[in-house]
């Protein structure tokens, strides 16, 4: 594990993550409009179901899987990865599948705002159930506020105020961040190719179990709640995809090197399996 930590520390890709995360969430804040949030809030049943699925059902599933696979080296990682659904890929899929884009944006916005509280709360619960995991509550909360909440709040505020530079910078940031995510999709796995190959067999069962469980739970619960097809599609996409940069950020903040490896494998499986399935399936 020490060798793995050295490889993670030496990764140029991972060193850029903490710098780019605030930029990413600032941009997200500038793209969030009050109108889209109001539109989403009008359907309270769908919004309540969607937000509860993200901040309660997914983390709870991660905790359950971590207990089932407690002897696996990545048992802690699966619990943490499911704290960060959505992300860049989910937004693209929602657009292509003609899902509920305001719902997708609002989900990401709300979960970003409350993420310091929800993440720390779930981390506390995880630490109780997994003896090998400990973390500093105050330090982690402050780091998440600085990296996620404040940049998002600043972006939302300047957009709400209609400041002239927002529109001028938005196109640049949009292209920059898309390029950045594309680049790290290749550079991250390339830099860490040896541990990815070494630990692939240990992680793949957890990843597949997670994806299948999410799919089945979401489809069953959405039928019980009786939400529209477009909303169902959007929520499923958000749940199946993983916020790659956030997962890597958590691995750095919490000093869990194996989580970076698991996060990359989870992300790659999402790209290779979930994305084609989502695009092909009606």
What annotation goes with each model-predicted range?
Residues 1-282:
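Alpha-helical transmembrane segments of multi-pass small-molecule/ion transporters
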